[in-house]
Amino acid sequence: MSDIAEPETHAPADDQLLIFTDAAADKVRELLDGEEGGDVKLRVFITGGGCSGFQYGFTFDETVEEGDTIIEKRGVKIVVDPVSGIYLQGAEVDFSSGLEGEQFIIRNPNATTTCGCGSSFAI
């Protein structure tokens, strides 16, 4: 038996680290249907950069690191590292399809300013 604790899985709740809408989960599941391999998850993260100081990132990942939070929605697993979780607390990830095209949208209550493109923010 290993001394390393398994990553914590959160059930949907109002105080959840990251809120993932049904539309976002459905789009991720659609994208993952074309992927081959093991248990692929969507990793949502924050990096330095962009015109406002921080920017959002998305990548598919098969690994879960110690301290990561796993959020499950409609059969899709979303992974957030502890540092990104600080900046994403209470944020909502949605998916929009319209005249402007298709895009994931993050509504972050922690952001004090955002870039016009919506991919970067400041706290």
From Swiss-Prot:
Can you list the disulfide-bonded cysteine pairs?
none
Query: Which GO BP terms sit in this record?
Result: iron-sulfur cluster assembly
Q: Does the keyword Nucleotidyltransferase apply?
A: no
Q: What keywords is this UniProt entry annotated with? A: Iron, Iron-sulfur, Metal-binding
Q: Which cofactor does it need?
A: iron-sulfur cluster
Q: How is the cofactor bound, as the UniProt entry phrases it?
A: Binds 1 iron-sulfur cluster per subunit.
Annotated residues that bind iron-sulfur cluster are located at 51, 115, 117
Q: Does the keyword Metal-binding apply?
A: yes
Query: Mind telling me which InterPro entries this protein's record contains?
Result: FeS_biogenesis (IPR000361), FeS_cluster_insertion (IPR016092), FeS_cluster_insertion_CS (IPR017870), FeS_cluster_insertion_RrpA (IPR023063), HesB-like_dom_sf (IPR035903)
Q: Which GO terms describe its cellular component?
A: cytosol
Q: Name one GO molecular function term.
A: iron ion binding
What is stated as this protein's family in its record?
Answer: Belongs to the HesB/IscA family.
| NCBIfam families in the cross-refs | iron-sulfur cluster assembly accessory protein, PRK13623.1
Describe the protein's quaternary organization and the partners it interacts with: Homodimer.
Function summary: Required for insertion of 4Fe-4S clusters for at least IspG.
What is the official name of this protein in its record? Answer: Iron-sulfur cluster insertion protein ErpA
Gene that encodes it: erpA
